[in-house]
């Protein structure tokens, strides 16, 4: 089975982008 987690990157002082990596 895959282990998944959220990878978040801060792209500005008020914005974040997140994606799920498996």
From Swiss-Prot:
Localization in the cell: Secreted
Organism: Heterometrus spinifer
Location (main, coarse): secreted
Tissue specificity note: Expressed by the venom gland.
Function (record text): Not lethal to mice by intraperitoneal or intracerebroventricular injections in doses up to 150 micrograms.
UniProt PTM comment: Contains 2 disulfide bonds.
Keyword annotations of the record: Disulfide bond, Secreted
TM region(s), chain numbering: none
GO CC annotations, alphabetized: extracellular region
Domain of life per record: Eukaryota
Name of the molecule in the record: 2.4 kDa venom peptide
């Amino acid at each position: 089975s895959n282990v998944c987690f959220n990878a978040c990157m801060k792209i500005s002082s008020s914005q974040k982008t997140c994606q799920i990596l498996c």
